[in-house]
Swiss-Prot record:
CDD domains: M20_DapE_proteobac (cd03891)
Pathway annotation: Amino-acid biosynthesis; L-lysine biosynthesis via DAP pathway; LL-2,6-diaminopimelate from (S)-tetrahydrodipicolinate (succinylase route): step 3/3
Subunit composition and interactions: Homodimer.
GO biological process, one term: L-arginine biosynthetic process
Keywords on record: Amino-acid biosynthesis, Cobalt, Diaminopimelate biosynthesis, Hydrolase, Lysine biosynthesis, Metal-binding, Zinc
Cofactor: Zn(2+); Co(2+)
Chemical reaction(s) catalysed: N-succinyl-(2S,6S)-2,6-diaminopimelate + H2O = (2S,6S)-2,6-diaminopimelate + succinate
Matches recorded under SUPFAM superfamilies: Bacterial exopeptidase dimerisation domain (SSF55031), Zn-dependent exopeptidases (SSF53187)
Record family assignment: Belongs to the peptidase M20A family. DapE subfamily.
Catalytic site: D68, E133 (proton acceptor)
Enzyme class per UniProt: hydrolase
UniProt EC number: 3.5.1.18
This protein's name: Succinyl-diaminopimelate desuccinylase
Length: 375
């Protein structure tokens, strides 16, 4: 027996939408949404396709997601070509099956069923879809949110379809995310011959005490919703490759995943103070890719928990762990934001797959959430 959620997921997977190329995925979704009365607004920026769609008016529940996927990697290692979806032993294989074309299909089918049963729903149902989440994310959701905020668009609740689950659908719901701050630091010295260190100034030696103290800092202890802030050195480079040249510069890149116990400015101030303490000559460039956000228990979280308990008979964990998502941009609108999607065990991997039955279940959960908030 055919299943509309599985069929739409397969159609989306067949479109090789490597970020930021949408490859026709959004046109497929838009066609379905138009048929059930959605107004569509294309909001493209640069090489990125985005759309904002809505039906009804009043209190607004938006479903957000991305059509782009990461590269497939070595296609010879896939059990089936990555953009030719196949079902084996109940598992749907294909790039994007879990992240996140399965969620997109579940959203659309849930909306179709919801509108059929509630043609005169009281609230507004919306979609915010982008083709640039996996890559730079510079022309995607962030730009759409800026445009919506500029015209004072209303957004009360947003469900992001990121693959939040770990073992079964709904066992984990993300009701927040940590902030992400990257420091690109260059320590300046004086290049010279290793046999004449008095004529040079080795930036590696200079930086070592600073780095040793930096990695030992306890930034905070987290709180009831967030783990402790973490700092990790990601890249470090110095030298010419020769064994007889003292380097003139040391480059080090480190990233903070920070909780609501800190702000990005607090982190910057402490790092700069440490640099001054060690009397280093330096240049620094900071990149804030997202502030931490948290959606406490309320109408959206309660509706999501209710849907999971109703269909899967489990009580989900509310977590803020993991990387960043487009939820960090949407939260700026003052909306309650949560993430609920399929199991994430194979995302970005060879042979990415999702349990086909999970997608059908997810569509029912999404529909129940719609019914609780905007029916």
């Amino acid at each position: 027996m055919s299943c509309p959620v599985i069929e739409l997921t397969q159609q989306l997977i067949r479109r090789p939408s490597l970020s930021p190329d949408d490859a026709g995925c959004q046109a497929l979704m838009i066609e379905r949404l138009r048929k059930i009365g959605f107004t569509i607004e294309h909001m493209d920026f640069g090489d990125t396709q985005n759309f904002w769609a809505w039906r009804g008016r009043g209190e607004t529940l938006a479903f957000a997601g991305h059509t782009d996927v990461v590269p497939a990697g070595d296609v010879d290692r896939w059990i089936n070509p990555p953009f030719e979806p196949t079902i084996r032993d109940g598992m749907l294989f294909g790039r994007g099956a879990a992240d996140m074309k399965g969620s997109l299909a579940a959203m659309v089918v849930a909306a179709e069923r919801f509108v059929a049963q509630h043609p005169h729903h009281r609230g507004r149902l919306a979609f915010l879809i982008t083709s640039d989440e996996e890559a730079s994310a510079k022309n995607g959701t962030v730009k759409v949110v800026e445009a919506l905020m500029a015209r004072h668009e209303r957004l009360d609740y947003c469900l992001v379809g990121e693959p939040s689950s770990t073992e079964i659908v709904g066992d984990v719901v993300k009701n927040g995310r940590r902030g992400s701050l990257t420091c690109n630091l260059t320590i300046h010295g004086v290049q010279g011959h290793v046999a004449y260190p008095h004529l040079a100034d080795n930036p590696v030696h200079r930086a070592a005490p600073f780095l040793n103290e930096l990695v030992a800092i306890e930034w905070d202890r987290g709180n009831d919703f967030f783990p402790a802030t973490s700092m990790q050195v990601a890249n470090i480079q110095a030298g010419t490759g020769s064994n007889n040249v003292i380097p003139g510069e040391l480059f080090v890149q480190f990233n903070f995943r920070f909780s609501t116990e800190l702000t990005d400015e607090m982190i910057k101030e402490r790092v700069h103070a440490l640099l001054e303490k060690h009397q280093l000559r330096y240049t620094v460039d900071w990149w804030l890719s997202g502030q931490p956000f948290l959606t406490a228990r309320g109408k959206l979280v309660d509706a999501v928990v209710n849907a999971i308990e109703h269909y899967n008979e489990i009580k989900p964990q509310l977590l803020t762990t993991g990387g960043t998502s487009d939820g960090r941009f949407i939260a700026r609108m003052g909306a309650q934001v949560v993430e609920l999607g399929p199991v994430n065990a194979t995302i970005h991997k060879i042979n990415e797959c999702v349990n086909a039955a999970d997608l059908q279940l997810l569509a029912r959960m999404y529909q129940r959430i719609m019914e609780q908030l905007v029916a």
